[in-house]
């Protein structure tokens, strides 16, 4: 320790070092987390303009779909790593817990998990970097929840292969990780980041005339609007609607944590009024 520890730094350290934490993951790898204090501040985001804004729809087959038609396909390179992980887990299950061979197998399993995590992080970082490089001043996304996208089948439970397969694809897509990393990058670059409420029917609403097609099925990747006869790509149409609703509801002209739809706000006010009336009746 007197001679120091050799480290590989991901980037140059700027600012005054406050704390330094050394950690070790289950795979036996050591990391150093350095907390620094700097005088620099984040740039102020510009005013929101429709011509410099983009909407992003997250998906399973395509990780991100932009309102300008650009699609970032989800990678299937996890499959080979996951098959290798399953092989190592079978070996670990045959070892006696606490023994030397069990410990060796456990480390191999941990390294396989770490490899899959690194592959997923690399994919997300590349997608975020490509989006930021396009020079958008405003980015609108849907505040999705993984639980809302999961298929629930109480009748068949865990034995529904179709449900498990789709839920696995949703987890692999890492929609939450993409949104978090994109928001962090927007903050550091001075880009407006707008989240719209998750229950807005972005896929079922025609961006040309505003007609909502309630009969749209999940398997339909393209559809024709019954009102204006416009031919729509499901994902691109959703991204355009996300952009439009994000810009129209953002009256402040700055980045907002989450933009609620007009109907959502009206329902919230109605619920508040009904609760006030019930309180008055109780007092009487």
What does each model-identified segment do?
Residues 18-24:
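Short amphipathic beta-strand and strand-loop transition segments with alternating hydrophobic
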Residues 11-13, 26-284:
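Positively charged, helix-rich recognition surfaces that bind polyanionic ligands
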Residues 1-5, 15, 29:
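"…together with the soluble PPM/PP2C metallo-phosphatase catalytic core" -> "…together
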Residues 4-7, 46:
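Short aromatic-glycine motifs in intrinsically disordered, low-complexity regions
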């Amino acid at each position: 320790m007197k001679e120091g520890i050799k480290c590989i730094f991901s980037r140059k350290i700027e600012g005054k070092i406050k704390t330094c934490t050394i950690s070790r993951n289950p795979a036996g790898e050591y990391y150093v987390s350095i907390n620094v204090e700097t005088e620099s501040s984040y740039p102020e985001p510009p005013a929101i303009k429709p011509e410099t804004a983009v909407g992003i729809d997250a998906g399973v087959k395509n990780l991100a779909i932009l309102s300008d038609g650009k699609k970032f396909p989800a990678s299937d390179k996890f499959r080979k790593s996951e098959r290798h992980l399953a092989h190592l887990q079978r070996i670990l299950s045959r070892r006696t817990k606490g023994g030397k061979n069990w410990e060796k197998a456990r480390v191999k399993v941990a390294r396989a998990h770490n490899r899959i995590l690194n592959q997923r992080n690399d994919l997300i970082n590349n997608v975020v970097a490509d989006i930021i490089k396009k020079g958008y001043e405003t980015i609108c996304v849907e505040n999705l929840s993984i639980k809302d996208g999961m298929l629930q089948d109480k009748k068949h439970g865990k034995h529904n292969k179709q449900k498990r397969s789709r839920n696995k694809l949703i987890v692999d897509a890492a929609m939450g990780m993409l949104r978090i990393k994109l928001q962090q990058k927007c903050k550091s670059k001075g880009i407006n980041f707008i989240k719209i409420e998750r229950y807005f029917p972005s896929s079922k609403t025609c961006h040309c005339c505003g007609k909502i097609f309630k009969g749209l099925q999940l398997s339909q990747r393209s559809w024709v609007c019954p009102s204006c006869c416009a031919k729509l790509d499901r994902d691109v149409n959703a991204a355009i609607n996300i952009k439009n609703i994000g810009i129209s509801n953002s009256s402040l002209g700055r980045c907002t944590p989450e933009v609620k739809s007009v109907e959502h706000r009206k329902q919230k006010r109605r619920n508040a009024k009904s609760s006030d009336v019930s309180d008055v009746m109780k007092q009487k």
